[in-house]
From Swiss-Prot:
This is Protein-arginine N-acetylglucosaminyltransferase SseK2. Its EC number is 2.4.1.-. Protein-arginine N-acetylglucosaminyltransferase activity is inhibited by 100066N compound (flavone analog) and 102644N compound (a substituted isoxazole). Belongs to the glycosyltransferase NleB family. The gene is sseK2.
Length: 348
């Protein structure tokens, strides 16, 4: 505990430096959090009114740490990066201290040693609202699909097209992928294929699966102290470089969903550093999963998240991308966004 406190004291000094740096960045835009229902109670986009749905002060916060190289940590150490440049563990602890009334989830995966698992358990004991959820404790079979089925469906669809409109390169590529899967692992699925490369696709894919479960993930994992969470509830995912400075309060989001938007040099883009949903199996995320089930090489960020959101809210794409980013953006004055951009991300 003394070790945690000493580290936390050091990091508070760094937090003040980061705040000073961010205050000098003219492209950082935030607004005051919505702590009471807006007078209109809805927002319009692409000619449709969407209700502003609440995420109350007990909606769990979720951080994620998937570690592909646990050996870089001590055998009895918490396997989450915690350096002066990248104080990710301290950011999580900081959130648990500020948001004492909320459950703070840490969604983890990796070939951890017995001592590292024990250290994660000790973290839960020291901060009673922190709940460590192991990826292996959750069942995702209801969201899975065999790769052979995905490939065969795409081959049938492509071959049904006229020769002039058919993408022959894609067709041949899918046929080759089907041949490889049938030869090497006919039972391979969308989920098992994302366990091969322990990189950002692995990280992004399982984040989306967790968000489909929402607060049900805590109940499924049997975490104590979560009895107050309602089945079918949502959660707020934060990258570990997102720094809380105060409580988030109750949030009101269009149809109960919002994500982080990066704004740099007059360019905006949807980012998965923050994803908030007010319910499990949000239809926008289900739409993205349908895209993953229908594409031969779906990407969990570009297809599942970005395209899934756009198809759900603006299927005909009558609104431009910037307008959609403005509509779906998660904003809050009590979060310093993407602090690793001030140093360098150490997740690799």
């Amino acid at each position: 505990m003394a070790r945690f406190n000493a580290a936390f004291t050091r990091i508070k000094i760094m937090f003040s430096r980061i705040r000073g740096l961010i205050s000098c960045q003219s492209n950082t835009q935030t607004i005051a959090p919505t702590l009471s229902p807006p007078s209109s109670g809805h927002v319009s986009f692409a000619g449709i009114d969407y209700p502003l749905l609440p995420l109350n002060h007990q909606t769990p916060l979720v951080f994620q740490w998937f570690e592909r190289n646990p050996d870089r940590f001590g055998q009895n150490e918490i396997p989450i990066i915690n350096t002066q440049k990248n104080p990710y563990l301290n950011n999580i602890i900081n959130a648990a201290i500020i948001e004492k009334e909320r459950i703070i989830g840490i969604f983890v995966d990796g070939d951890f040693s017995k001592g590292q698992r024990k250290a994660l358990g000790k973290l839960e004991q020291n901060y009673r609202n922190i709940k460590v959820i192991y990826n292996s404790d959750l069942n995702y079979s209801m969201y899975d699909k065999k790769l052979t089925t995905i490939y065969l469906e795409n081959i049938t669809k492509l071959e049904a097209q006229s020769a002039s409109e058919r993408d022959e390169v894609l067709l041949n590529g899918v046929k080759k992928s089907l041949e490889d899967v049938l030869k090497n692992n006919p039972e391979e699925t969308l989920i098992s294929s994302h366990n091969k490369d322990k990189g950002h696709l692995w990280f992004d894919f399982y984040r989306n699966l967790f968000l489909l479960k929402g607060s049900d993930a805590f109940l499924e994992a049997g975490k104590p102290g979560c009895h107050h969470l309602q089945p079918g509830g949502g959660c707020i995912y934060l990258d570990a470089d997102m720094l809380l400075t105060d409580k988030l309060g109750t949030l009101y989001l269009p149809d109960g969903i919002a994500i982080h938007v990066s704004r740099k040099d007059n360019h905006v883009s949807l980012e998965n550093g923050i994803i908030a949903v007010n319910r499990s199996e949000h239809p926008a995320l289900i739409k993205g999963l349908e895209i993953m089930h229908s594409k031969p090489y779906g990407d969990p960020y570009n297809d599942w998240l970005s395209k899934g959101l756009r198809h759900y809210f603006d299927g005909s794409h009558i609104q431009d991308y910037d307008a959609f980013c403005d509509f779906i953006e998660f904003k809050h004055e009590n979060i310093i966004m993407n602090t690793s951009s001030l140093t360098a991300s150490s997740w690799r």
